[in-house]
Curated annotation (Swiss-Prot):
It catalyses: N-terminal L-alanyl-L-prolyl-L-lysyl-[protein] + 3 S-adenosyl-L-methionine = N-terminal N,N,N-trimethyl-L-alanyl-L-prolyl-L-lysyl-[protein] + 3 S-adenosyl-L-homocysteine + 3 H(+); N-terminal L-seryl-L-prolyl-L-lysyl-[protein] + 3 S-adenosyl-L-methionine = N-terminal N,N,N-trimethyl-L-seryl-L-prolyl-L-lysyl-[protein] + 3 S-adenosyl-L-homocysteine + 3 H(+); N-terminal L-prolyl-L-prolyl-L-lysyl-[protein] + 2 S-adenosyl-L-methionine = N-terminal N,N-dimethyl-L-prolyl-L-prolyl-L-lysyl-[protein] + 2 S-adenosyl-L-homocysteine + 2 H(+). It comes from the Eukaryota. Pfam families: Methyltransf_PK (PF05891). Alpha-N-methyltransferase that methylates the N-terminus of target proteins containing the N-terminal motif [Ala/Pro/Ser]-Pro-Lys when the initiator Met is cleaved. Specifically catalyzes mono-, di- or tri-methylation of exposed alpha-amino group of Ala or Ser residue in the [Ala/Ser]-Pro-Lys motif and mono- or di-methylation of Pro in the Pro-Pro-Lys motif. Probably required for the synthesis of neurotransmitter melatonin from serotonin, which plays a role in promoting a sleep-like state, called lethargus, during larval development. Disruption phenotype: Causes significant increase in synaptic transmission including 55% increase in amplitude of evoked postsynaptic currents and 102% increase in the frequency of miniature postsynaptic currents. Decreases total and motionless sleep due to increase in the frequency of active events during sleep-like state. It comes from Caenorhabditis elegans. One of its GO terms (cellular component) is cytoplasm. This is Alpha N-terminal protein methyltransferase 1. Its EC number is 2.1.1.244. The keyword Transcription does not apply.
Length: 234
């Protein structure tokens, strides 16, 4: 989430291993989940709620039955964003200790569904289960090929009319940047748009996060639908 200084290409498995090590060491609280930027929590959740409400008004997904939180950690987004909207929420994270901590952070709530402990590079959401798949501040850990493959698997996880939302930092530099601390890339918007196209996803809505400090790279939200649904870009 922070600034980075490199655009080097890395071996995927090496990056995944080091990223998992980084998050395994993170403090198991909101500050840890936000990389030391706890003050981002309130404006982040507020903007995300507005984005979901906007998607509803545009009829970009039909129901609020089932959502999936990818890179859920202790459940910050699950608890404060998805549970207020959806009847059931599944969680995914590569670090088992963080998923386990969610029992304390959220509590034993009947609206929490399955908890998947697996990296996104191999994770396949259950097919045709979700009205919304939310992917926040985690896509930068995937190399390009794995990101596209993951998006394709997410599309299969959607119910008819379902929607994927990607929320992540976007660099204004000409090339992506690599963060040597958490081992993630901050991609350019053209790179993200190419990944959407390669995944046969249409971008049906997008928004810029507001209220963040200037030293944070811009954060954007993209709503995506499989191309066969017939929606066009907004």
């Amino acid at each position: 989430m922070s600034s980075s200084s490199s655009s080097r290409i890395h071996n995927g498995e090496d990056v995944y291993e080091k990223a998992e090590e980084y998050w395994s060491r993170a403090s198991q609280d909101v500050n840890g989940m936000l990389g030391g930027f706890e003050a981002l929590h309130a404006p982040d959740i507020s903007a995300s709620k507005r984005f979901i409400e906007g998607l509803k008004k545009k009829n970009l997904f039909g129901y609020f039955d089932y959502a999936l939180d990818c890179g859920a950690g202790i459940g910050r987004v699950t608890k404060h964003l998805l549970m207020p909207f959806f009847s059931k929420v599944d969680m995914e994270d590569v670090v088992e200790e963080l998923i386990t901590k969610s029992d304390q952070y959220i509590g034993k709530h009947p609206r929490i569904g399955d908890k998947f402990v697996e990296g996104l590079q191999t994770f396949a959401p259950p097919e045709r289960r979700y009205d919304l798949i939310w992917i926040q501040w985690v896509s930068g850990h995937l190399v390009d090929e794995d990101l596209v493959d993951f998006f394709k698997r997410c599309a299969k996880g959607l119910k008819p009319g379902g929607c994927i939302v990607l929320k992540d930092n976007v660099t204004n530099h000409e090339k992506r940047l690599f963060d040597d601390d958490d081992h993630s890339w901050t991609r350019t918007e053209p790179e993200l748009l190419k990944a959407f196209a390669d995944s046969q996803l249409d971008m049906v809505s997008k928004a810029l996060q507001t209220g963040f400090p200037k030293e944070i790279y811009p954060v954007k939200m993209y709503a995506l639908k499989p191309q066969h649904t017939g929606f066009t870009n907004n």
